[in-house]
């Protein structure tokens, strides 16, 4: 199994040829994890991810495997609440109250989005002038100022790191002389009989 230990932000990926690149569709929770095993879209194989901690992948970012293979990140549709208001002041007031509850919040010019929560919907209904609509949408909250979560040492993720390393080792040993690594490859190998679920993930707070 190939490992991606870096990625290119979507704003810097415009010059890349991604026409044949596989994709991987991830929820926000998955895009915030630095260590995991991914099932690529359309059954195009697996990829181990081991990027720098504290990063949040966004729709259109490009993971780069150790052999130079590109994998395009696609944000999954999620169950969110979209908040609109009659005036900018009322929208700002809604953002203030949601922020007081430490909610991950996506802030756009004319609306807010957060992970759907019926309790928060009821709270917003009491503000007046605010409408919250439940829908399925890409969710990309502003997490840049806070990083990817709070960590206390390496113990939380050691098991995941070790399992990922073991999976990569055994995948390589199963095909020790199948190809040369000198020139690199422009594709990701197909799956090796694993199930359709993602592997174990880091614990994020």
Swiss-Prot record:
GO molecular-function terms, A-Z: nickel cation binding; unfolded protein binding
Entry-linked CDD domains: UreE
Subcellular location: Cytoplasm
Record keywords, A-Z: Chaperone, Cytoplasm, Nickel, Nickel insertion
Keyword Chaperone among UniProt keywords: yes
Keyword Isomerase in annotation: no
SMART domains membership: UreE_N
Segments for region (Disordered): 171-205
GO biological processes: protein folding; protein-containing complex assembly; urea metabolic process
NCBIfam families with a match to the protein in the record: PRK13263.1 (NF009762)
Biological role stated in the UniProt entry: Involved in urease metallocenter assembly. Binds nickel. Probably functions as a nickel donor during metallocenter assembly.
Name this protein carries in UniProt: Urease accessory protein UreE
Source organism per UniProt: Bordetella bronchiseptica (strain ATCC BAA-588 / NCTC 13252 / RB50)
Gene name in the database record: ureE
């Amino acid at each position: 199994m190939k490992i991606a230990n870096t990625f290119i932000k979507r704003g810097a990926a415009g010059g890349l040829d991604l026409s044949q690149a596989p994709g991987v569709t991830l929820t926000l929770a998955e895009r915030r994890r630095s260590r995991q095993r991914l099932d690529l879209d359309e059954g195009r194989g697996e990829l181990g991810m081991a990027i720098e901690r504290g990063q949040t992948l966004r729709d259109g970012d490009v993971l780069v495997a150790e052999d130079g293979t590109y994998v395009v990140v696609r944000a999954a549709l999620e169950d969110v609440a979209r908040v609109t208001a009659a005036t900018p002041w009322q929208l700002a007031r809604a953002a203030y109250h949601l922020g007081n509850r430490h909610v991950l919040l996506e802030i756009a010019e004319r609306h807010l989005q957060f992970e759907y929560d019926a309790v928060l919907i009821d709270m917003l209904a009491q503000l007046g002038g605010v409408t919250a609509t439940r829908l399925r949408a890409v969710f990309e909250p502003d997490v840049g100022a806070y990083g990817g979560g709070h960590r206390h040492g390496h113990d939380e993720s050691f098991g995941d790191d070790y399992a990922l390393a073991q999976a990569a080792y055994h995948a390589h040993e199963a095909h020790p002389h199948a190809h040369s690594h000198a020139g690199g490859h422009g594709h990701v190998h197909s799956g090796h009989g694993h199930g359709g679920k993602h592997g174990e993930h880091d614990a994020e707070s």
